[in-house]
UniProtKB/Swiss-Prot annotation:
Main location: cytoplasm
Keyword tags: Cytoplasm, Fatty acid biosynthesis, Fatty acid metabolism, Lipid biosynthesis, Lipid metabolism, Magnesium, Metal-binding, Transferase
Protein name: Holo-[acyl-carrier-protein] synthase
GO cellular component, one term: cytoplasm
Encoding gene per record: acpS
Length: 127
């Protein structure tokens, strides 16, 4: 059964401006340690900005599916986005968020980017 659905669309240039203006403070707020490690390995600036924008969108979509938004005990750090060898994105959610449910849940994530925008779609469902 679907518990929640979330989507987010972000302008990549807006994320790039935040990175330029706030630097590591912004990166540390948005990316987990594992994501930050992957981001630091990207040498192309456009790809690096897209990487951050997609993760930002994914986490915003996740909190919309959760129904909480960022704040009130939920932060960007509670969500990690990685990829399977096939390229499929995977959303890993902190146990403190999962513990809110008395039943097992699954998170499904779809990401896309096209020129100026990054978009994420998240479905939260009971198993």
């Amino acid at each position: 059964m679907i518990i929640g659905v979330g989507t987010d669309l972000v302008e990549i240039a807006r994320i790039a401006q935040s990175i330029e203006r706030l630097g590591e403070r912004f990166i540390d707020r948005i990316l987990t340690a594992a994501e930050k490690e992957r981001w630091s390995e990207i040498s192309n600036l456009e790809k690096a900005n897209s990487f951050v924008a997609k993760r930002f969108a994914a986490k915003e979509a996740a909190v919309k599916a959760l129904g909480t938004g960022i704040g009130l005990g939920v932060s960007f750090q509670h969500f990690n986005v990685s990829n399977l060898p096939s390229g499929q994105p995977v959303l890993t959610v902190d146990e403190s968020i999962i513990a809110r449910y008395d039943f097992p849940v699954s998170w499904h994530l779809s990401l896309t980017d096209e020129k100026a925008y990054a978009q994420a779609f998240v479905i939260l469902e009971s198993k």
